[in-house]
Design a protein with these regions (language model features):
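Charge-rich, low-complexity N-terminal segments
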Residues: 1-52
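Intrinsically disordered, low-complexity regions enriched in small/polar residues
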Residues: 25, 29, 36, 53-57, ...
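Amphipathic, interaction-prone secondary-structure segments
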Residues: 30-86
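Intrinsically disordered, low-complexity regulatory regions enriched in serine/threonine/proline
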Residues: 68-143
């Protein structure tokens, strides 16, 4: 679901804004889109908070023009902020995916065109810091 559609209270608004700022800390040229989907009311998208980060052009270092960031969440009515279960990032060039990393399992980056080592390391740092950001309610699986 679009990150902009997930804002239901001040705490989640703060987490969403902080997640975008955290990504931009490592990739300052990226602009954030809090509504990457035209229609995010799809039932299958209810368990994600989705962002898109667009770069000014194709970057040979990161091997893409945009990154789709999906935070897999579990909404518990008792918590004001959802639990972060996992993260999926996809490096995109229209119309195809160039690479992907998921924090469920081995945290391996796969794809046809992987980012350079420094950018790859920064993407993993973003994931680790997102778990820290949501740590008050997170069940993350990596130190």
């Amino acid at each position: 679901m679009n990150a902009s559609s997930n804002v239901s209270n001040v705490e989640i608004a703060n987490k969403i804004a902080s997640a975008a700022a955290l990504f931009r800390k490592y990739f300052p040229d990226a602009s954030v889109n809090f509504s990457p989907w035209e229609n995010s009311n799809n039932e299958s998208m209810q368990d994600t908070i989705d962002f898109a980060f667009h770069f000014p052009g194709w970057s040979p270092l990161i091997e893409c023009r945009a990154i789709l960031l999906q935070l897999r969440i579990k909404n518990d009515n008792n918590d004001r902020v959802p639990k972060l279960l996992g993260i999926i990032m996809r490096g995109m060039i229209v119309p195809s995916e160039r690479w992907r990393v998921a924090t469920i399992g081995d945290w391996e980056m796969t794809g046809t065109h992987l980012p350079q080592k420094e950018q790859k390391d920064n993407l993993f740092l973003v994931c680790k810091e997102l778990y820290k950001l949501f740590s008050t309610t997170s069940t993350g699986n990596k130190n």
